[in-house]
């Protein structure tokens, strides 16, 4: 199966609505992201439903805890069979290393382990508010380097940082980019955004797209259009 670049961010508070949407799209066209709200509401059984339908799942729970607790949560995600799981890079090198090491017994079947750098809603004043006198881009660079040094597979970052991180950390270090809006879409609550084609050109490996697909009249067509637009730049 080809390496789908689009990850559709599911955002529903009713499982029936989520599955009704999922049944309109093809697992060959995208992967799916399940975040904190949906996982708290519906639990592992919902992830199993998505797996039954043939979808790869990015479990976006952003674990951040002491190394022992965080790594065990990552192992629980691996037991669920998810394709990707993430942890907050600000949890530090020991936490990330423990999380990576606990996945080693899974071999080729282990999920990708990704670090979260700076949330795309965060601006300089937000960082200042938590005691970080640093530009968001510099904090992203610092945390991304720490993530790579901890042996993780990549980071979540905004598309604006992608070319810089590819240059610094190499082409095999995966960049997962939220804040992607197809041309003509509403910006929503993301501060740092970019179109799918621009993001891939900038170095993003996977594109997280939510409402422009989930709220579309014909989500399958929107996905098809995005994938067609990406074909020349892959």
Curated annotation (Swiss-Prot):
UniProt-listed CDD domains: OMP_decarboxylase_like
Gene3D superfamilies per the UniProt record, alphabetical: Aldolase class I (3.20.20.70)
Gene source species: Aliivibrio salmonicida (strain LFI1238)
Subunit structure: Homodimer.
EC id: 4.1.1.23
Top EC class for this record: lyase
Protein name listed in UniProt: Orotidine 5'-phosphate decarboxylase
SMART domains reported for this sequence: OMPdecase
UniProt-listed PANTHER family: OROTIDINE 5'-PHOSPHATE DECARBOXYLASE (PTHR32119:SF2)
């Amino acid at each position: 199966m080809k390496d789908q670049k689009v990850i559709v961010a599911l955002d529903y508070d009713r499982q029936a609505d989520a599955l009704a949407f999922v049944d309109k799209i093809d697992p060959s066209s995208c992967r799916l992201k399940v975040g904190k709200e949906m996982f708290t509401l519906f639990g592992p059984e919902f992830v199993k439903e998505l797996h039954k339908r043939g979808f790869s799942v990015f479990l976006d729970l952003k674990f951040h805890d002491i190394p022992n607790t965080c790594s065990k949560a990552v192992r629980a995600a691996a037991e669920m069979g998810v394709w990707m799981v993430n942890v907050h890079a600000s949890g530090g090198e020991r936490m990330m290393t423990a999380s990576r090491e606990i996945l080693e017994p899974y071999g080729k079947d282990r999920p990708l382990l990704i670090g979260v750098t700076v949330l795309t809603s965060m601006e300089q004043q937000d960082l200042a508010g938590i005691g970080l006198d640093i530009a968001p881009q510099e904090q992203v660079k610092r945390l991304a380097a720490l993530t790579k040094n901890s042996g993780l597979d990549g980071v979540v970052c905004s598309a604006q940082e992608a070319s810089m991180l590819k240059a610094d950390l190499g082409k095999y270090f995966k960049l997962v980019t939220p804040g992607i809006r197809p041309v003509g879409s509403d910006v929503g609550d993301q501060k740092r955004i970019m179109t799918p084609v621009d993001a891939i050109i900038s170095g993003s490996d996977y594109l997280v797209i939510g409402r422009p697909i989930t709220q579309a009249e014909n989500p399958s067509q929107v996905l098809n259009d995005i994938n067609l637009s990406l074909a020349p730049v892959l």
